[in-house]
Amino acid sequence: MKRFISIIVFAVLSVFVASAQNDTIKVLAIGNSFSEDAVEEHLSGLLRAEGLTVIIGNMYIGGCSIERHVKNLRGDIADYRYRKIDPQGTMQEINGYTLEKALADEDWDYVSVQQSSPLSGQPESYVLLPELVGFVRARIPEDAVMMFHQTWAYSEDSSHKAYVNYDRDQMKMYNAIVETVAA
């Protein structure tokens, strides 16, 4: 498992390093607590450790699903906490932000979207993903890269109430997520 994680981290860093041409890399996550952990903390730190200049944006709503993101974009609902980390690593948080406003804030190089963890292994919960991606794609530079942030399975001893969706079985949840995302 550690080898697999190392390969993934190397692959992700390689993509960002290859695209950095003595320029600032701008990454926007449209997500939830998983994007807070993975993008704000881990990716930001890894890129800075490589000596890269990076701006991280995170449109954050705890537990936010694709369905809720689409509801927010359709209604231009200012329901997000926009957390932005500047090139010096300083974070600013603004409450009451819309997707439209965040997408216009920078010429983003990378934009990730994700599903909420309870729904991440349920294929029927992704029916609105094309609408979310289309909305984002129409508002970012043509050469920007859209990414899907795959969530991870809960820990074996998780007390998360949605863990019952996977019979409280970490491998069952992991396999459901992988199969759903690959479809």
Where on the chain are the PLM-derived regions?
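Positively charged n-region of N-terminal signal peptides that target proteins for export
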Residues: 1-4
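Bacterial N-terminal signal peptides
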Residues: 6-15
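Residues in and immediately flanking transmembrane alpha helices
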Residues: 15-16, 45
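Boundary at the C-terminal end of the N-terminal hydrophobic targeting segment
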Residues: 18-22
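Conserved SGNH/GDSL esterase-like catalytic core that processes O-acyl groups on lipids
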Residues: 26-28, 37-129, 142
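A short, structure-level motif marking secondary-structure boundaries and short turns
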Residues: 27-29, 166-167
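Alpha-helical cap/lid subdomain in secreted, periplasmic
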Residues: 96-183
